[in-house]
Amino acid sequence: MSILKKLKCQKKKYLIYLNKCLKYKLLDNILWVISMFKPKALYCENNIENYVLGRELLEKYADVPKVIIDNHNNIEEMRKKQNKDFADMKRNLIIGVRKTHKFVPNHKTSDFLVPYTSSGCTAMCMYCYLVCNYNKCAYLRLFVNREEMLDKIIRTAQNSEKDLTFEIGSNSDLILENTITNNLVWTIENFANTPKGHLTLPTKFDMVDDILPLKHNGKVTIRISVNPEEIINKVEFGTSRLKNRVQAINKLADADYPIGILIAPVILVENWKELYSNLIKYLYENLNEKAKKQAFFEIIFMTYSFVHRAINTEAFPNAIDLYNPELMRGRGRGKYMYKDYIREEGEKFLRGEMQKYFPNNQIEYVV
């Protein structure tokens, strides 16, 4: 059988199995599919061999079919795919050189949002804001020029009068990426002893063991995103279970990492008050004392879009519809957010629940 026929056969079996998992809510089975991630094809810019990481990835995936591309941002074959192919497109791995290094000012938990070693993800959260940026092409892209990117962060920190914090995970999930590239280990090892600056990154994954023994000097803050198990099951396909995320928070606290907890995104399904009340109680009952003492919180309500809905309807026909016209209003071009009074009610409720269980912990913001 030719390679092309094998790939088509694998794709058909994969999509049938994935949709069966969605129909019957078999989250563990979906996690198995994602955790066994091996790209069905590599799409590589032709200059990645000039970089150490590029050569390492080519060696690691030597048996995977390869397609040479001119630009990771413009793969015509991918752009022509249909929305129903979204999940299958996530099985590709794109490798290139990041050409844009623009730091975007930020006023939440960092001073700058920094483009770093990856964008996109192998998981399939139905609300992912990267879909707004990349449409159905929100697959994982790895950038091999990590030395250039980290060097700019270090120089910017060194030349600043104040101590800066850089958000390096706004375009991807670096805990997930680390399982493929070891980039987060490399980053922490090369940043920890610099005289100025801090790094921060969010994650929905629990695979933190590789970074626990590192000498981080308190310069890297890991923020774990949590949601009720029902939401994870129905919406956050291919991410870690709530129990495992909480265990990861405890491990990070014990390893003296600064930690944050994102309750995000808050999704107002029918029984949302019960779900999020139980979530906050679960955190209180299962976080260790060290984590409970030091963690700060962020609360983010879901923003949705026409693009999300179009892709989800075709790619995941058995999944929940997150669009609720009774609760949502338009925001900008093709985006939806919860109506102001609905969001205000949600914030009041969540702040009340947080006061019950975490009265002494800082809530950085609610948006």
Briefly describe each language-model feature range.
Residues K152-N159, D210-K215, L242-A255, L350:
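Structured alpha-helical segments in the cores of large, soluble enzyme domains
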Residues R245-H308:
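Conserved C-terminal portion of the radical SAM core fold
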